[in-house]
């Protein structure tokens, strides 16, 4: 593990490097940049630089940071506003045009599905193939490979042009044979060689199906490629850490970087115990981290395993009246719940069970990242959860500013630098994201820290956030004065560059 002194020394060195780059820029202000962001409060979570500066951008990169006036073809006035690295969403399930629209208005410049993943990862985000306003990518989806091997399903993601994936096949409920496990291993290797950003494992959706040997194979394969695993752990009774213990043991045994998905929604009232277990494992040399949402309900399919085959009311400590039908916002009773489960098994519900004090406790953990876990959204007529539109404005407005859970710089670190640093274990493309430094990618958010807030709510999920003025992706504005710029697609499909020496 890296010592605290080493980290502090590195941070000081980075700060001096940033100051040097600013000083250097004073001698070359005659250059004309593609874009200059002028007069904003620049906040870089890696160096802790926090000051008024001008940023020069050329060819999608930050090339100068200066207190001097810079010339540019486009000047963005950021006076009175914070200039932050773009927000990196590591856990989203909505690579759609509507999802993209609401994401950029919430400051998201990179949208990833690492929990579920896809297979092959090169096919992820079919709606973005003609161009994307944000960067996007996925892990290698174990669930999709399981479907291919066990059900001959070629559906590589939750949805495609042919519709939604079925939740009724053998892939969700049946143990695999040793031969099938070996076949899955080869597909996982193929997905990683195609550039998948690690391996995503929806373990809780197939609790009775995935054996210890199959799960161990997944971690062993990740170890071959020194790439992360992202796990939705098996869920027990409220607070039961057995599912976490299982994953920690595998992460330590195989030496694999492991992310526990939406820990607050899995740990519930046991969040303190769960985080202490992660701390203990990391003190022994493990590489384990986690993330949470900024909204309190869970969202998933009404036909998910936990709602079909297990005692979900005991597991979540709720009842039918705590469940909301996502497409319309209707609150359910037992009769309506069972009817919708029969008639619309691929549709979603919000189950309201997380308490805010659990979330606040999670956010106080220094390594906690924040993600959306946004459900698929295609049009305004069919509702989804508010995470899609308001996650980051809600986090910065309510938890950072209003409740004071952490300082603004630390809040920005959770949604920019920490995801970028973690994902550098999967792909070198993240080494220049999540920072405001010379040479970094010009993925930037400009917002008003006094007014940023979410308007999206359960039952009214498509209200865009307020307080976010401008968003740049690869140096090109995709949000200007709070409005999306139509027809501008600077986003890239992010994959892992292959390295013949290391297989990555």
PLM segments and residue spans:
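Active-site microenvironment of metallo-dependent hydrolases
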Residues: 5-6, 12-15, 22-53, 58, ...
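Conserved beta-strand scaffold positions in the cores of enzyme catalytic domains, especially
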Residues: 36, 75-77, 87, 136-138, ...
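Metal-associated gating/positioning segment near the N- to mid-region
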Residues: 68-70, 77-131, 251
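Conserved short loop/turn motifs at secondary-structure junctions
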Residues: 91, 203-208, 233-238, 262-268, ...
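Short, acidic/polar
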Residues: 95-101, 180-190, 242-243
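Divalent metal-dependent hydrolysis catalytic cores, especially in the metallo-beta-lactamase
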Residues: 101-122, 133-144, 192-207, 225-234, ...
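Active-site-adjacent beta->alpha loops and helix N-cap segments on the catalytic face
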Residues: 119-124, 209-218, 243
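Active-site neighborhoods of metal-dependent hydrolases
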Residues: 149-210, 248-252, 256-408
């Amino acid at each position: 593990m890296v010592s605290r002194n080493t980290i502090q020394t590195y941070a000081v060195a980075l700060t001096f490097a940033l100051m040097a780059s600013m000083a250097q820029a004073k001698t070359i202000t005659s250059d004309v940049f593609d874009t200059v962001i002028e007069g904003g409060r620049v906040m870089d979570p890696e160096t802790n630089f926090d000051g008024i500066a001008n940023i020069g951008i050329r060819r999608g990169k930050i090339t100068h940071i200066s207190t001097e006036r810079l010339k540019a073809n486009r000047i963005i006035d950021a006076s009175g506003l914070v200039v932050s690295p773009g927000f990196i969403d590591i856990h989203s399930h909505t690579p759609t045009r509507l999802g993209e629209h609401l994401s950029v208005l919430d400051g998201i410049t990179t949208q990833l599905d690492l929990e579920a993943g896809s297979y092959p990862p090169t096919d992820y985000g079919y709606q973005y193939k003609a161009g994307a306003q944000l960067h996007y990518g996925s892990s290698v989806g174990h669930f999709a490979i399981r479907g291919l091997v066990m059900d001959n399903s070629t559906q590589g993601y939750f949805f495609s042009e042919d519709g939604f994936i079925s939740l009724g096949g053998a892939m969700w409920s049946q143990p695999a044979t040793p031969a099938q496990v070996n076949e899955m291993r080869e597909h996982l290797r193929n997905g990683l060689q195609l550039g998948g950003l690690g391996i995503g494992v929806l373990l809780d959706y197939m609790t009775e199906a995935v054996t210890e040997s199959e799960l161990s194979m997944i971690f062993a394969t990740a170890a071959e490629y020194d790439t992360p695993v992202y796990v939705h752990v098996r869920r027990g009774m409220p607070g039961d850490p057995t599912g976490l213990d299982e994953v920690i043991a595998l992460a330590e045994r195989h030496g694999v970087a492991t992310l526990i998905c939406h820990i607050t929604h899995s740990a519930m009232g046991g969040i303190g115990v769960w985080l202490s277990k992660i701390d203990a494992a990391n003190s022994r040399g493990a590489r384990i981290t986690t993330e949470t949402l900024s909204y309190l309900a869970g969202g998933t399919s009404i036909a998910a395993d936990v709602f079909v085959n297990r005692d979900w009311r005991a597991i979540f400590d709720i009842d039918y009246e705590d469940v909301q039908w996502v497409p319309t916002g209707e609150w359910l009773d037992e009769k309506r719940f069972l009817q919708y489960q029969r008639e619309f098994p691929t549709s979603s519900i919000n189950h309201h069970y997380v308490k805010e004090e659990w979330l606040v406790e999670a956010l106080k953990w220094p390594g906690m990242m924040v993600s959306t876990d946004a459900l698929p959204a295609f049009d305004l007529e069919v509702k989804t959860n508010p995470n899609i539109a308001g996650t980051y404005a809600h986090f910065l407005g309510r938890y950072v500013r209003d409740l004071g859970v952490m300082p603004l710089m630390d809040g920005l670190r959770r949604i920019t630098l920490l995801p970028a640093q973690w994902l550098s274990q999967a792909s070198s493309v993240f080494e220049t994201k999540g920072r405001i430094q010379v040479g970094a990618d010009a993925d930037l958010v400009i917002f008003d820290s006094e007014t940023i807030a979410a308007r999206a709510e359960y039952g009214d999920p498509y209200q865009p956030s307020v307080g976010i003025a401008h968003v740049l992706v690869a140096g090109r504005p995709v949000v200007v004065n709070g409005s999306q710029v139509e027809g501008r697609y600077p986003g890239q499909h992010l994959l892992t560059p292959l390295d013949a020496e290391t297989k990555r």
